[in-house]
Amino acid sequence: MKLLILGGSGFVSGRLAQIATAQGHEVWCVTRGNRPIPEGVHALTCDAHDPAALRAALASAQLQWDAALDCICCDAPSASVDLSVLPAFTNRLLVISTDSVYHPAYKRVPQDETGVYLHDGGYGSSKRQMEEVFLDAAAHSESPFAWTIFRPGHIFGAGSQVGCFPEHSRQPDLIARMKRGEPLRLVGGGKFLIHPIYVDDLCRVLLESIPVSTAFNEIFCIGGPDIVSNAAYYLLLGEILNVPVTIEEIPLAGYLEAHPQFSGHLCHRAYSLEKLRRTGIALPSTPLRAGLQKQVEWLLSLAR
């Protein structure tokens, strides 16, 4: 297939471009050109959130794509750009949202695709407003243009730092700290659940979803095969590094009020994948231990 990726130089978008190319697809990446993109892909340089610039960049390629995959759609305006520009160049769009769209005070375990959403102006709220633009468009249009949205939680793998929870979320010196025997400070002792997904699994599901009609104009929760506490994640990381782990509890009371940016973390993040299962798309299968081992090996290789 001919695939258009909005993004291509980031953690997820770059890996998506690599995997798509390895599968034999021809890939174009839209970036601002400030960072390198994977080898073997075509570069389209513009601000993807500027509709005129995006339209001109896509027109310059003089082709139709089998699908577009937007890894950088972050709010209602960017969703509106997708809907105003992309249908002239493709009939299919995959979008990455976030599990942070849910209001943490009302989440269930496991949480499905319906729920109470944030409207506080933060990251999760902006992503939900993005979703609402697509939902509204689908409800008021008979266009053949079809989208699918996925809500991953913690995405992990080579290309990103380890750590999934405050105060050690994607911390560049986390491995060094652990090797020095420093205690880890986790809010609430890390009692909340997470449902991490290995980056390669997320990319595979995105690509496999392209022709699946039962996924058209639908939103899906997505996560890997393991649901663990945040504390268990760090203990597993210690096992992989062969170092002991001591966890110091940061009181939960008052932390969210002082650090509202972590609202999507200070709750259980465990999801039902039943809706995704019913499409027939193979569910993510990489165990947390296996994916985290690969991530650690990649990070250690950078330090050599």
Residue ranges of predicted features:
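Conserved Rossmann-fold cofactor-binding substructure of NAD(P)-dependent oxidoreductases
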Residues: 45-64, 74-80
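Amphipathic terminal alpha-helices
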Residues: 286-304
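Alpha-helical substrate-binding/gating segment
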Residues: 173-185, 191-227
